[in-house]
């Protein structure tokens, strides 16, 4: 426990007094942190997160994330427990209240695991290098056939994931297009493999997308191939509007379980937050900011002969 004494500073005056105090106290507090050499830091407010240089993120928008800096490898971003007693709406339109107690407790438990060594979070660059080897991108119709044959011949107990990348969020728009269709499945060795099939691009000369879609549709229309997705109702509607295909064999939507677990917590249902909350050990937290690098890594894993095909 440490306290920073600042003489002549009235914390009740001026704009953003908390930030002003922290800015003045930062050198002292950072020196105390270096001296204590903690295994993990739990940051409860955005002011602390930013003024002490832990990260540039907002605690509200980035709750649950694990950041690092030059002197501490693990900084858990969470919310101050006081929000559980504040039944009011914050500036972002989100309701504070007792519903937040569970997610704050989850973040503290995550910090405890980090301190004990029970949780180790790889660097994002290392994680991307590792997982990029399990991502395959179709570059010809023959590869599309290979991908769909793999999916068709999985054991009957298998479940595949399905996701679309689209030109927008409105499937009824005249400009709505499906950019890629992506599938995931677990191999016999236990790895998760991702199969990506591009369907539209301004410079796409690899193959005719309509032919590729004919093979994809066979997978989507097969009720015996069990499918899951995150907010899969969007993919179902978009597919129906753009192609007329009504997806069969859907068994689960992972967003629904997040709605149950994080009931009442706005903006806590996306994949970005789910990665930090439930699979931080993969090191893929923050992946959405590194997608261009991931694409480059995947491309580098392909041989020149494969690309030329």
Where are these regions (language model features)?
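N-terminal accessory regions of nucleic-acid-interacting proteins
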Residues: 100, 104-164, 168, 209-212
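Residue-level marker for buried hydrophobic side chains located in beta-strands
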Residues: 77, 160-162, 250
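Short, basic/hydrophobic alpha-helical segments
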Residues: 25-29, 33-37, 146-153, 207-224
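Short amphipathic alpha-helical segments
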Residues: 53-56, 173-174, 239-241
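A polyanion-binding, active-site-adjacent surface
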Residues: 1-118
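Active-site-proximal helix-loop-helix substrate-binding element of RNase H-like nuclease domains
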Residues: 73, 82-85, 91, 115-139, ...
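A short alpha/beta connector and helix-capping loop motif
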Residues: 171-186
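Acidic beta-strand-to-loop metal/phosphate-binding motif
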Residues: 37-45, 161, 224-232
